[in-house]
């Protein structure tokens, strides 16, 4: 009997079993993540990609797009989910937000190409229709930086063995992972959009690498400041989650022994 139990525990799952378990875990996860946080996260992701269409500052050594004004909220939400549910859960939430963003962009594009007999909607169509390479650059940057942020946040958290649920642990892991993640997000997006695609499709408009680098650094610093301002709220919310048992069913499912 003991031998059979060890076999069940140690045997490798089949691909079908893995798919079924991941499906069940994902269903439980999205039932467990508070709807308010998930909504804010998705709205932030969709909004920052629309705002990224506008360059608000451009000098010889500096350039900033509008997306940095809201992107900090998405990283704070990811940090909170990593802390309570784990990095895998945050990655799934990141992928979900990306898929929603792609759907919204597709709907915007369809609306932008529908002809209308009324006033000129050229500017409106350009804004909501977006540009395919901005969407592509944004998707690559977001998914890459999201995964970097989530795993880095979790990794730093494992270093706090004495008081992993304390303020110091939460703030340290959030600040470091947010700065690194935001820098990667900004650099990947600005390099792909303004150095690779824009010179080809925007009549020669472009940023230099110095501008991309300074944009990435300054954007990460500004977003870090926002994280510092609002992370105490994030800490209090995650502490309340722990106290009230938010996501217990999901956590029990992923921590069970097979």
Residue ranges and their predicted role:
Residues 50-58, 106-120:
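Transmembrane alpha-helix boundary signature
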Residues 1-4:
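Short, Lys/Arg-enriched N-terminal segments with co-localized hydrophobic residues
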Residues 177, 181, 251-258:
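Cytosolic juxtamembrane regulatory segments of multi-pass membrane proteins
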Residues 178, 186-198:
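A structural feature that tracks compact, well-ordered secondary-structure segments
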Residues 98-101, 113-117, 121-145, 158-165, ...:
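Membrane-embedded alpha-helical bundles of multi-pass transporters/translocases
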Residues 6-98, 102-103:
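Hydrophobic transmembrane alpha-helices
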Residues 45-50, 75-79, 101, 105, ...:
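Transmembrane alpha-helical segments of multi-pass membrane transport proteins and ion-pumping complexes
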Residues 35-39, 69, 94, 135-136, ...:
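Hydrophobic alpha-helical transmembrane segments
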